[in-house]
Regions:
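Transmembrane helix-loop-helix hairpins at lipid-water interfaces of multipass membrane proteins
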Residues: 1-37, 61-115, 196-200, 302, ...
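Hydrophobic alpha-helical transmembrane segments of ABC transporter permease domains
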Residues: 2-3, 66, 74-78, 84, ...
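Juxtamembrane helix-loop junctions of ABC transporter transmembrane domains
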Residues: 26-43, 66, 74-87, 108-155, ...
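A short amphipathic helical element positioned immediately N-terminal to and/or at the very start
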Residues: 43-57, 158
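An intracellular "coupling" helix at the cytosolic face of ABC transporter transmembrane type-1 domains
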Residues: 55-59, 147-148, 164-173, 177, ...
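Helix-loop-helix
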Residues: 91-100, 193-207, 277-356, 361-362
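ABC-type nucleotide-binding domain
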Residues: 363, 370-371, 377-632
Length: 632
């Protein structure tokens, strides 16, 4: 075997250098921008933030580390025991001795299996708790984002961050980190064991490391790119599905099913191609590493067999059949962790990429935040004042231009105007759904920016243009999961707003199921439920945004009756399409292009024959035309 020393030494030296290179390639960071993973956060920063979530569970990780030592010990010791058993079998041996060695091996195997099982159970439970905490933090943070920010971020993207990306992170806690450490120590331990057993054969094994390094570096480059494509395509298809499933009725109305199907097919095919590329990369890497493993085994069998037959020895150590068997097992245990390290590192980078996406949402500063000296609003009279308020959704494109008006407590004020005049925007600003750029908005003489947002919104009952009902029951949608509200109180409120007239006809009453977005109820029924939901929380100011749009005449009469009753609750601000519903308002404010052009009572504005008169006349003639068409 000494004849092969020059080749073995050269190969081993190259192997050691290559091992250092692979460590540098996989461990040393190459800056923030990495191939296939465009990132803005450093790995160390991401890891630190992830560890902050793991810190409360450090005891569990200590136990896992202790259990992992048994698995590492088994991987290192078991080949030596099997080699010893093989030597006993081929030579003269006592049956008791063989039994003791076999029993010892079985005991170590059982202990290792038990440790691996408990390690997996602890990691799964701990990892899921960590990810559950992260998801909760993410959801709570999303709830704090302003309306403007929620409008900018697609719903599908938020869903992907909360589900797919957190699942990718969970893999790191349940598998990757522990196995990365385990594989690293197994490689070191096996290398030391092989050197201790026979360094000549160890040199032979090291000769194959340069090829593993080459394959791993190439694999790293392409696999990370493939990971990124899969993630981007997954986010894209989730966003598309979220949007188009919500708008499926529009798709059907305009007969766009085929066109939408083609778009979905394109996105689905893009995801399929990305996944195929990922499978192809892994499918090439694994056989190549397996080929190196087989090559090293063949070299072991040739060199080991030749040395065994020739009785070659080194430093007085004879090359035995048991040693060859041990090395055969060591080679398998040496190559598997190296292959796993390459793959697991890329999965880890994928988890880091997902973590950065999650943290990018968590790092979004809510645009609506309480001022440091914000006060708690205990009770309000309902006096509202706008003082030269300017607002724009897009910088420079003013939606409101110097709007000023005053609302006395208990008054009912209506806002009218053409689409885009700023009616709904005014109502959104009062509740601080958006932040205005100039001027002041006062509630009982207090600037709303000096009031805590939660405290402010508790005093307002908001009914937005699009009435949103959650999946659940009528009861859960009215109380919004708030405890302490009895069914009697709920029915009293429903009776107050005339919602009981259709609830009592339902098979399950308050327990009637509500499907997604309340699509099993009519627009008018959803509006009445929205009234009940608002009133039951006892607001001081009622905000009705286009409350009587798109409903039947019978339900409109019920809603008008409800609105008359609600005037007694407190200050009421109304935006309505049908001007007939606001004739009894204390004051009507007419807006055009973001400015107040008229204000007064219904009769005063009609007498002035200005913008309100034009809108009212136009709507009156349209309603008369609709009635005549209906008679025909």
């Amino acid at each position: 075997m000494h004849n092969y020393y020059p080749i073995l030494w050269v190969g081993a030296i190259i192997g050691v250098i290559s091992t250092l290179l692979i460590v540098a390639a996989f461990v040393v960071k190459d800056g923030k921008k990495e191939t296939g993973f465009e990132r803005n956060m450093k790995d160390s920063e991401i890891m630190q933030r992830l560890m902050d979530y793991a810190k409360p569970f450090y005891r569990q990780f200590i136990v896992v580390g202790f259990l992992m030592l048994f698995s590492i010990a088994y991987d290192i010791i078991s080949p030596l025991i099997v080699g010893k058993i093989e030597e006993l079998v081929v030579g003269k041996f006592a049956l008791n001795t063989l039994f003791l060695w076999v029993a010892g091996y079985a005991a170590i195997l059982l202990v290792s299996m038990a440790c691996t099982y408990f390690q997996a159970v602890i990691l799964q439970k701990t990892g899921q708790k960590i990810i559950s905490n992260m998801r909760e933090d993410l959801f709570v943070h999303i709830e704090r984002l302003s309306h403007e920010q929620l409008n900018e971020i697609p719903v599908g993207k938020l869903v992907t961050r909360t589900t797919n990306d957190t699942n990718a992170i969970s893999l790191m806690f349940t598998n990757l980190l522990v196995n990365l450490l385990k594989n690293f120590f197994v490689i070191i331990g096996i290398l030391i064991a092989m050197l201790f057993l026979n360094y000549e054969l160890t040199l032979m094994v090291l000769c194959f490391v340069p090829f593993i390094v080459l394959f791993s570096i190439i694999f790293r480059k392409f696999s990370r790119r493939a990971h990124r494509k899969v993630k981007d395509c997954t986010t894209d298809i989730n966003t598309y599905l979220s949007e188009n499933l919500s708008g499926m009725k529009i798709t059907q109305i305009f007969n766009r099913e085929d066109a939408k199907m083609r778009e979905f097919t394109d996105k689905s095919n893009a995801l399929g191609r990305a996944q195929q590329e990922q499978i192809f990369v892994f499918g090439i890497f694994r056989p190549l590493v397996y080929m190196l493993y087989i090559s090293s085994v063949l070299c072991l069998l040739y060199l080991g067999g030749k040395g065994y037959l020739e009785g070659t020895s080194f430093l007085g150590q004879t090359l035995t059949s048991g040693m060859i068997v041990s090395f055969y097992m060591y080679i398998s245990k040496f190559f598997n962790p190296i292959q796993n390290l390459a793959e697991q590192f890329n999965w880890l980078q994928s988890a880091f990429a997902s973590a950065e996406k999650v943290f990018s949402i968590l790092d979004l500063e809510p645009k609506m935040q309480d001022a440091p000296d914000a006060i708690e609003l205990t009770d309000i009279k309902g006096e509202i004042e706008f003082c030269d308020v300017w607002f724009s959704y897009i910088p420079g494109e003013w939606v409101l231009k110097g709007v000023s008006f005053h609302v006395n407590p208990k008054e009912t004020i209506a806002f009218v105007g053409s689409t885009g005049s700023g009616k709904s925007t005014i109502l959104s600003l009062i509740c601080r759904n958006y932040e205005f750029q100039k001027g002041e908005i006062l509630i009982d003489g207090i600037d709303i920016r000096k009031i805590k947002i939660d405290s402010l919104r508790k005093k307002f009952g908001q009914m937005l243009q699009d009435v949103f009902l959650f999946s659940g029951t009528i009861r859960s949608n009215i109380i919004l999961r708030e405890e302490g509200i009895s069914d009697e109180e709920i029915m009293d409120v429903c009776h107050y707003v005339n919602a009981d007239q259709f609830i009592n006809k339902l098979d399950h009453g308050l327990d009637e199921p509500v499907r997604e977005r309340g699509n099993n109820f009519s627009a008018g029924q959803r509006q009445l439920l929205s009234f009940a939901r608002t009133i039951i929380h006892k607001p001081s100011v009622m905000i009705l945004d286009e409350a009587t749009a798109n409903i039947d005449t019978e339900t409109e009469l019920l809603i008008q009756d409800s609105m008359e009753k609600m005037k007694n609750i407190g200050t009421m601000l109304i935006v309505a399409h049908r001007l007939s519903t606001i004739q009894h308002a204390d004051e009507i404010i007419v807006l055009s292009h973001g400015k107040i052009v008229e204000h007064g009572t219904h009769q005063e504005l009609l007498a002035a024959q200005g913008r309100y008169y034009q809108l009212y006349t136009l709507q009156y003639h349209r309603e008369q035309s609709e009635k005549q068409s209906g008679r025909k």
